[in-house]
Amino acid sequence: MEIVFSKNALFLADVILTDSRSLFGEKAFTKMKDAISLAIKRIEWSPRYGSLEPALADEEGEYRFVLLNKRFKMVYKIEDENHISILAIWDVKQNPNNMRLYT
């Protein structure tokens, strides 16, 4: 199973992790980093582990998400049985229609 982060997902993850550390401290940073790592392991173990992403239901392909915590979710697309693309680490307070920018 190959899991690939898009450039946008890498950028968003970096911003979120950097902000977690600078605003809330090392413990918050570690907690978020561990949540991302665990989500990747779960997706690798079972690609359909995440729920279907309702904001992308009209898009072609199978888009899913895994909650990282109360505020963030990891949005991904199952490309085929051996490839998954991580599209975004999404702040759930954002307008879900903007998620289409990452597909």
Regions inferred by a protein language model and the residue ranges of each:
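Arg/Lys-rich, positively charged N-terminal/basic patches that mediate binding to nucleic acids
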Residues: 1-37
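Charged, solvent-exposed alpha-helical segments that act as regulatory interaction surfaces
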Residues: 22, 26, 45, 49-52, ...
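A short, surface-exposed loop/turn module that caps and links secondary-structure elements
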Residues: 41-67
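Enriched for short, Lys/Arg-rich terminal
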Residues: 68-103
